[in-house]
Structure formats: structure tokens, C-alpha cells
Amino acid sequence: MELFSEKISIKETNVLLKVDNPKLFKIAKKKIIDERLNLEKYISKNPVFLTTYSPFKISNDAPEIVKLMANSSENANVGPMAAVAGTFSELVIHSLLENNSKSAICENGGDIALSSDFDIIVGLYAGNSPISGNLGFKLKKEKIKNGYGVCTSSGTVGHSVSFGNADSVTVFAKSASIADAAATSIGNFAVGSPDEAINKCLEQAENILKIDGVFVTFQEYAGKVGKIPTLIRTEKKEAFGNVFEMV
């Protein structure tokens, strides 16, 4: 099945969206604008929410995006902004599902939310690691049809804050918001030699609830914990967000 693609950029939010119906682009863009406004208004009144590296206590009347970010950060013991990209992706996909989308992928800086009635292959982009571009994950339609998250944190690629040095920490979870915060938390433990760093990451992953599995790469080394999708070989070398196939 062929999907329609469009890049949507609104201030710091830059997403690659793939949908089965081009009419959904307008809905997605409105959702991003609305949620950005909600987040910006909240931060203007609660500036610590933007800068803290620790979970932030919120009130019951906080906007949905703030609640998702706060809950995900508490689950992983990181600051709420660690979940911002995955949360935007998740909210977009849920909005599209409510508007009869059958297959949609929203990628925001390596943090992906998706839903599909087809299997989807997501390629692994891990910076300079020799593993990068050679492996992909086959996500089964039964697992992703109502929404799913695949989020990656890196200490060597991108502008997001990470206190570790892993080339990639990919987390799989029902919620992209949960996966995003978890990936940041786990990636912070990637210190020491490659094998030490990977083991520390996997130990931290076992302390985090609500995630299905984790795949970590550090140079030519890799490790996993929990249940991850089937690994397959791929020859794709594009950036993480461009490596999607419907099968």
C-alpha cells in the first residue's frame, strides 16, 4: 500500500507524516498547532516544566499534552521535555485514528507513533555504528493497528540532551510518549566501554514500566531486553524517519 508523505514544520516541531489519505494532512497540522499552543501557554505559567531534568508535578486541569508528558517522565524518572517529541507524534496519530485513518506514521526527530492495518518495517538509524542502516524492525499489524510507539535516543546523533554515549537506544511501547521518555532515561546510562554501557542500559530498562522492549547499539555492539519486533536485514541507509516500508 502506498502512503502519501508530507513534512510539517511549525516552530521547533518538525515531523514527517505518512498517511493513506492526503486529506489527513490538514487534520494533523491543526492538531500540532493546537497542542503547541496548549504547551506554550502552560510553560509560560510554569517555566520549570521546560527546564527540569526531574519529573514535574502538575494539576488536574493541565492540558492533555502536559499530562501525557508529565506521566511519561514520571514513569521513566526524567524531565517532562524528554517526552515532548513522542507525545506530539502520539497525539497526531490518535487524532488521525479518530478521523478514520487506516495507516499513518508520524516521525518527530526519531520518535515515531504509528498505526496501520499492514505490517510496517522501520529501519534502524544509529549514527556511525556499523549496524546503522543494516537492520530493521518488522512491526506486525496486529500490534500497531490501534497505535504504537517506536522511539530512539542517541548520545552521538541529533540535538536532544543525553548524558550517555550510545549510538541508539530504541524503545518499543504502546505509547510513543512513554517510549520517548524511557529512551532518554535508558540512554543516560550508556557510559563506560561499549559492553559496560549496553549492560547498564539494559539494567535500567528493566526498572521502567509500560514498555515492551529495548534495543541498544554502541559502535559494533548491540543488546536487547524484553520483547522487540522481529529484526530483519535491510540495505537502506537513509535517516531513521525515511526508512518505512509497508509489507
From Swiss-Prot:
Q: Which Gene3D superfamilies match?
A: ApbE-like domains
Superkingdom of the organism of origin:
Archaea
The UniProt entry's sequence similarity note says: Belongs to the UPF0280 family.
User: Any idea what this protein is called?
Assistant: UPF0280 protein Mevan_0550
